[in-house]
């Protein structure tokens, strides 16, 4: 089964078994909802953890898992990734994509020039920014806006962009 990262446990919180999670998903309310199962990446098989409660606190998501009732139970989870199974991913609207679908796509301009591959996605504020790794040049930062991104073709594994003045 495939799993996708939705956050990282960065620390424990309090003594009653809560963990502090740095979320890496755009769907915080859905992913960290009571009753959902997340998987802890560890050596061997991912460990399924059912969410008992969740709340926001100072930019983090505080999560309590069923059956883990004190700090000693969850201390071992620190610095581990939390994942969701591919089966649990919600279908997205047209024109919306999961990060794992975008990373690795080839990038071409509207006139057919190959620019490189998307290696990372940044979320600095108003819109995402795709980091395009280019051979023998520094990385290109592409804002994900309609004026720049013209087409995403997941079947053919490429994105068509129109470079605005000053981007390259």
UniProtKB/Swiss-Prot annotation:
Residues 94-167 form the PRC barrel domain. SUPFAM superfamilies: PRC-barrel domain, Translation proteins. GO terms for molecular function: ribosome binding. Disulfide bonds: none annotated. An accessory protein needed during the final step in the assembly of 30S ribosomal subunit, possibly for assembly of the head region. Essential for efficient processing of 16S rRNA. May be needed both before and after RbfA during the maturation of 16S rRNA. It has affinity for free ribosomal 30S subunits but not for 70S ribosomes. Belongs to the RimM family. This is Ribosome maturation factor RimM. It comes from Limosilactobacillus reuteri (strain DSM 20016) (Lactobacillus reuteri). The gene is rimM.
